[in-house]
Amino acid sequence: MAASWRLGCDPRLLRYLVGFPGRRSVGLVKGALGWSVSRGANWRWFHSTQWLRGDPIKILMPSLSPTMEEGNIVKWLKKEGEAVSAGDALCEIETDKAVVTLDASDDGILAKIVVEEGSKNIRLGSLIGLIVEEGEDWKHVEIPKDVGPPPPVSKPSEPRPSPEPQISIPVKKEHIPGTLRFRLSPAARNILEKHSLDASQGTATGPRGIFTKEDALKLVQLKQTGKITESRPTPAPTATPTAPSPLQATAGPSYPRPVIPPVSTPGQPNAVGTFTEIPASNIRRVIAKRLTESKSTVPHAYATADCDLGAVLKVRQDLVKDDIKVSVNDFIIKAAAVTLKQMPDVNVSWDGEGPKQLPFIDISVAVATDKGLLTPIIKDAAAKGIQEIADSVKALSKKARDGKLLPEEYQGGSFSISNLGMFGIDEFTAVINPPQACILAVGRFRPVLKLTEDEEGNAKLQQRQLITVTMSSDSRVVDDELATRFLKSFKANLENPIRLA
């Protein structure tokens, strides 16, 4: 044995004898021989029972964003039995923000795909695959017993014919004189009791079958003309008395409600009274959750201002002559970043206990995609030039629409901008994206005639290109006065592009 250590041996055989994976064999073999071992040594690689084969490396569903709770396996990029190296792309995972590639962290062979591609709603930490060391029998690898199966997942299935819609039809019942079939308004009940009339002798015309005061007055008129007579209730059949429950004893008289067909029922598309369920993606569910939380927990305040784009459009035309293509939205991003630098009190967030001033100026730009609204980030926007901002917006927008955004490209941000001007919207209000404190909603620029004065003081009409911007702010950290001053400074910066240099 001493000679074998001195003369050397097959590294793979050495690994099998000691019981450690090859990539970790150097440090761990030293520990087995009594040499110093760092505290970070991973002792899970000792195998007392399977000393001729190492345990497989588990591939777990990772957390790829702060808000991610589950993910979908879009596609496996490696097949079972295929060799992988650290850094190789294993599969594509759809998170709550984008489709992200999961890379291998170890060398070896992909032995088993536990969760097939197309599986959805896989919880974080669930086992999705196994990797074994090179040279091991990957075909007979077993799923570790200490890892249970992942929670139920929804896999793509063949469309099944929807059941025929079932519509409830009121069943005609024999009416017992003296009983009420309608819900009565208080005024109608008083009139009927006063004149000893029964609502069943008339017709309910109120919404959802309510017998109204007007319906009761019609019955009184019919009684006065002799067309109907007083209603005398027929004694109900004798029933064995039972002790009423406390709830029944305190409850007032109840009247049966009219049977109303359901507004919609699951069924075949285009059928009357049916609907089609639309599966929600992870992105759509997270957007719905976060927007609901924002509107219900963040006190929104709004401030609006009109900005003259005359100078911006002139600068933009000059840049086009030099083959520099930038949009009005790029100027808006730059103006917002410069204003945040001038007013750091607005560059804040709410962390649950109090305000927190942010040391960076990262602008989140809303981008519409097929899967929902995403907000890639223009980092350090105040230090970037207009052309740099334009290039960043184009690149990030394309990645967002292709579902290729990296987590660091959409996580964070200190201020958001949402522009619907390209859709012909004049103005709107946007929902704050927590923990950010503000979002700026931008409408389209439109021609407006304004009365101005020339150099000689003569009044004249001039056409101006105006846009309306509305800032939604978190009143807990940005009050109305601060929001107003911010918009005033933003307007001045945008209307004078030289300030953005």
Curated annotation (Swiss-Prot):
Swiss-Prot/TrEMBL GO biological process terms: pyruvate decarboxylation to acetyl-CoA
Known outcome of mutating I210A: Strongly decreased DLD binding
Region of interest called Disordered, as start-end residue ranges on this chain: 142-175, 225-268
Residue ranges with Pro residues bias: 147-164, 255-264
Residues modified as N6-lipoyllysine: K97
Feature: transit peptide: 1-53
PTM text: Delipoylated at Lys-97 by SIRT4, delipoylation decreases the PHD complex activity.
Annotated keywords: Acetylation, Lipoyl, Mitochondrion, Phosphoprotein, Transit peptide
Residues modified as N6-acetyllysine: K194
Annotated phenotype, changing I210R: Decreased interaction with DLD
Listed result of changing R208A: Strongly decreased DLD binding
Domain Peripheral subunit-binding (PSBD): 183-220
GO-annotated cellular components: mitochondrial matrix; mitochondrion; nucleoplasm; plasma membrane; pyruvate dehydrogenase complex
Molecular function terms from GO: acyltransferase activity
Family, similarity comment: Belongs to the 2-oxoacid dehydrogenase family.
Disease entry from the Swiss-Prot or TrEMBL record: Pyruvate dehydrogenase E3-binding protein deficiency: A metabolic disorder characterized by decreased activity of the pyruvate dehydrogenase complex without observable reduction in the activities of enzymes E1, E2, or E3. Clinical features include hypotonia and psychomotor retardation.
Subunit structure: Part of the inner core of the multimeric pyruvate dehydrogenase complex that is composed of about 48 DLAT and 12 PDHX molecules. This core binds multiple copies of pyruvate dehydrogenase (subunits PDH1A and PDHB, E1), dihydrolipoamide acetyltransferase (DLAT, E2) and lipoamide dehydrogenase (DLD, E3). Interacts with SIRT4. Interacts with DLD.
Protein name: Pyruvate dehydrogenase protein X component, mitochondrial
UniProt source species: Homo sapiens
Gene that encodes it: PDHX
